[in-house]
Amino acid sequence: MHRLLAWDAACLPPPPAAFRPMEVANFYYEPDCLAYGAKAARAAPRAPAAEPAIGEHERAIDFSPYLEPLAPAADFAAPAPAHHDFLSDLFADDYGAKPSKKPADYGYVSLGRAGAKAAPPACFPPPPPAALKAEPGFEPADCKRADDAPAMAAGFPFALRAYLGYQATPSGSSGSLSTSSSSSPPGTPSPADAKAAPAACFAGPPAAPAKAKAKKTVDKLSDEYKMRRERNNIAVRKSRDKAKMRNLETQHKVLELTAENERLQKKVEQLSRELSTLRNLFKQLPEPLLASAGHC
């Protein structure tokens, strides 16, 4: 961690035109912000500037070459290269003439690292370009014809590599994906599935049925054939006799039920006649007799 002491103006970017530096409680990093270790030699003290508006740790800088890079300048013999900027010039001005030891290779970014030859001599070199991740290609899992099988077999090693990149288990069966996220692409089918896919999608012509068993030639004049026919005839006659018996029993049952129904109907008619006779008798009796009979 840096120490909050004083910030060197050489490490600051050029301020805008309407910007005035803020000095609150004098919290600046000390001038050794470009030091390579914790015990680096501090920069030599500078003479105070003539103008009273500039602070102790600041100095007057001519911004005209940087604000107008295309304008001709009398102080510069040739225009500065494109890769040089304001901070790089300040860095070269402050530390270019002083001999320094080889900086220690720490984890944080070293502002004056001697090994970074490709980066411009600025306080903060640009970060290296990020490596591009190449995603494996995926082929559509559509069913192909049987004549495309040689082409599929030719491209099988690449499909297998892409498949192994997304399959969690290196088995022949289709395993689970490496991540459960729904944004990850589906895995390539396994070799067994790829071989079985054409057969599942295109069944092709139906397989020829197995050759029927050759019919055994039977000699109708043989005793075995005659015995079989006789047994079949006996079984047919028995079944017919049973059917006739069931029909006769059903007819007999129907006749019995019909006779019972007629008998009951006759009984109902007789009772109806008796009821009507009794009603007529009660109508012919006198009322006083009926009243006395009711009290009894």
From Swiss-Prot:
Changing residue 276 to A: Reduces phosphorylation in response to calcium. Residues 22-104 are annotated as: Required for MYC transcriptional repression. Disruption phenotype: Embryos display defects in brown fat tissue development. Females are sterile, ovaries lack corpora lutea. Upon bacterial infection, animals show impaired bactericidal activity and die within 3 days. Posthepatectomy, animals show a reduced regenerative response with DNA synthesis decreased to 25% of normal in hepatocytes and a prolonged period of hypoglycemia. Animals show osteopenia with decreased bone formation and enhanced ostecolastogenesis. Long bones have a 1.6 fold diminished bone volume with a reduction of the number and thickness of bone trabeculae. Changing residue 98 to R: No effect on transactivation activity. Not acetylated after glucocorticoid-stimulation and no increase of transactivation activity. One of its GO terms (cellular component) is condensed chromosome, centromeric region. Sumoylated by polymeric chains of SUMO2 or SUMO3. Sumoylation at Lys-133 is required for inhibition of T-cells proliferation. In adipocytes, sumoylation at Lys-133 by PIAS1 leads to ubiquitination and subsequent proteasomal degradation. Desumoylated by SENP2, which abolishes ubiquitination and stabilizes protein levels. Ubiquitinated, leading to proteasomal degradation. Its main location: nucleus. Changing residue 101 to R: Not acetylated after glucocorticoid-stimulation and no increase of transactivation activity. Gene3D superfamilies: 1.20.5.170. The modification Phosphoserine is found at residues 184, 239, 276. It is found in: Nucleus; Cytoplasm. Important transcription factor regulating the expression of genes involved in immune and inflammatory responses. Also plays a significant role in adipogenesis, as well as in the gluconeogenic pathway, liver regeneration, and hematopoiesis. The consensus recognition site is 5'-T[TG]NNGNAA[TG]-3'. Its functional capacity is governed by protein interactions and post-translational protein modifications. During early embryogenesis, plays essential and redundant roles with CEBPA. This is CCAAT/enhancer-binding protein beta. It comes from Mus musculus (Mouse).
